[in-house]
């Protein structure tokens, strides 16, 4: 009799876990909460974005006639990161950091702005994005260290460079995190555009819109998973 009870309890627990995973992996919430780079829902935009899709189209034709040099570095934890460099005849440099789910080339309008002001341009695919390695998007937690590495790369190659660091959305949060570090004197300015102050609050707000996810306290479970698999918590 007790064996039957144990089997029933175990079955219920397994079912509960399966439902939890399904909700994270199949619902609209997944797009907002996933940190996996190849997730199916990461390719799906929100209903609002889809409704106004013309506003979000990105024309990449500006890059076609530009002498872009592809460069790469190794991150502190051994990932190969892909960067793109546009040279100008000046000591002014702009490091441009993209946001969640984007790629370096999609920062075209910001790159264009700096380039037309005669800045050398370094933009790159964040870890877990584009042509850079990494299975996980770290919401700035490790990315700001990558910014440090890219800047060290520039300074080593161009000792007299004067650097402006610009970040958008998750990139904005990343450069904010970088701003709290001990920076080389070459870094003259940091610009953060529409950053979040807390990735935990952003994801928690989305999760709480689902009754089931709010009941099972998604963020507590999610942070346990992140700490175990990736080494940090939101």
PLM regions and their residue ranges:
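Short beta-strand element of the alpha/beta-hydrolase
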Residues: 91-99
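Alpha/beta-hydrolase active-site loop
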Residues: 137-158
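Conserved alpha/beta-hydrolase
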Residues: 111-133
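A short loop-to-beta-strand scaffold at the N-terminal edge of the catalytic core in hydrolase folds
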Residues: 76-86
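Glycine-rich nucleophile elbow surrounding the catalytic serine of serine-hydrolase chemistry
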Residues: 167-177
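Hydrolase active-site cap/lid region
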Residues: 177-234
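An N-terminal hydrophobic leader/cap segment in hydrolases
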Residues: 12-74
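Alpha/beta-hydrolase fold nucleophile elbow
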Residues: 158-169
């Amino acid at each position: 009799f007790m064996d039957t009870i144990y089997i029933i309890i175990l079955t219920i627990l397994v079912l509960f876990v399966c439902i939890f995973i399904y909700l994270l992996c199949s619902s609209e919430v997944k797009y907002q909460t996933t940190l996996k780079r190849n997730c199916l829902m990461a390719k799906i935009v929100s209903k609002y974005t889809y409704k106004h899709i013309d506003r979000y189209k990105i024309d990449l034709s500006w890059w076609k006639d530009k002498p872009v040099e592809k460069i790469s570095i190794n991150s502190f934890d051994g990932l190969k990161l892909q960067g793109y460099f546009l040279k100008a005849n000046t000591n002014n440099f702009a490091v441009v950091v993209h946001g969640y789910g984007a790629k370096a080339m999609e920062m075209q309008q910001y790159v264009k702005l700096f380039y037309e002001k005669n800045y050398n341009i370094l933009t790159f695919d964040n870890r877990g994005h584009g042509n850079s390695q990494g299975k996980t998007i770290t919401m700035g937690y490790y990315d700001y260290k990558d910014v440090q590495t890219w800047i060290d790369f520039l300074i080593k190659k161009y000792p007299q460079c004067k650097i402006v660091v610009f970040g958008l959305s998750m990139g904005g949060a990343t450069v904010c995190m970088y701003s709290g570090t001990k920076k080389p004197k070459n870094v003259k300015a940091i610009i953060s555009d529409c950053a979040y102050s807390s990735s935990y609050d952003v994801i928690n707000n989305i999760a709480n819109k689902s009754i089931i996810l709010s009941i099972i306290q998604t963020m507590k479970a999610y942070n346990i998973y992140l700490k175990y698999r990736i080494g940090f918590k939101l």
